[in-house]
């Protein structure tokens, strides 16, 4: 390992900020909340006097495991073996804290699918099909084992406050008034797995489509793949040449969890 090259690499932050004012929570899941627990001094605030046991600040967070930039472990869609549930199997024991970190990093292959972004109908996602990936390979070379495929949809532009931010998830999923984000079909997940790809990332709310999110999760996670969702800044990466890293919070028996995604670019 060339430590000098590593130390001089440019770091690109691929994580989105989590806030009560931003659309980072899947509709119907636990709402994100961030509140103060202890303040430097007892002062009057909008909800009363702050707690202050000592002169320091600490806050507490309530959030869904799949809020903000996060990853899906197999247990997100694979029930535990012996549960008697459909699709149960050994991967149902691979919780987030048991996913090896090396599975969440590798050379990045950025597949630009922004051209699909305006092709969805209200409440429906345009699908990224195997032929889209094959066309990318014809131009950029075959995908290699352990490469991390990052789908650049451009959907992160809707991760904003206010009415415009409703296009990120609320419009496609709740009201059905706006199109869904581009998302890989189940067949695409299988194709990537057959190419030796372990991890897929996307700069959109989910690897799953707005209209049928479950099958692609069952196909991919059921094969031991890992999905990293709600990324950003994929436009700062070359098609190839960056090294992707996702470092999740190590939560016992989780179905995945939030973390920090980044890419290392050699100078």
List the predicted regions and their residue ranges:
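Active-/binding-site microenvironments in catalytic and ligand-binding cores
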Residues: 1-267
């Amino acid at each position: 390992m060339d430590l000098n090259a590593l130390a001089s690499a440019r770091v690109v932050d691929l994580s989105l900020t989590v806030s009560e004012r931003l659309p980072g929570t899947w509709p119907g899941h636990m709402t994100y909340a961030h509140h103060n627990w202890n303040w430097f001094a007892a002062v009057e605030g909008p909800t009363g006097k702050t707690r202050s046991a000592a002169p320091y600040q600490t806050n507490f967070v309530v959030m869904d495991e799949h809020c903000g930039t996060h990853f899906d472990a197999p247990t997100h869609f694979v029930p535990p073996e012996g549960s008697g549930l459909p699709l149960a199997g050994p991967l149902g024991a691979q919780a987030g804290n048991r996913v090896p970190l090396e599975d969440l990093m590798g050379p990045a292959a950025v597949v630009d699918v922004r051209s699909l972004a305006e092709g969805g109908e209200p409440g429906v996602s345009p699908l990224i099909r195997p032929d889209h990936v094959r066309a990318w390979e014809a131009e950029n070379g075959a995908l290699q084992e352990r490469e991390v495929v990052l789908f650049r949809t451009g959907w992160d532009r809707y991760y904003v406050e206010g009415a415009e931010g409703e296009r990120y998830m609320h419009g496609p999923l709740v009201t059905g008034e706006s199109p869904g984000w581009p998302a890989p079909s189940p067949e695409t997940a299988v194709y990537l797995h057959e190419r030796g790809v372990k991890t897929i990332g996307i700069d959109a709310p989910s690897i799953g489509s707005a209209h049928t999110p479950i099958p692609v999760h069952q196909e991919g996670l059921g094969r031991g793949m890992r999905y990293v969702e709600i990324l950003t800044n994929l436009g700062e990466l070359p098609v190839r040449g960056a090294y992707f890293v996702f470092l999740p919070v190590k939560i016992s028996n989780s179905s995945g969890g939030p973390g920090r995604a980044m890419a290392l670019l050699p100078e």
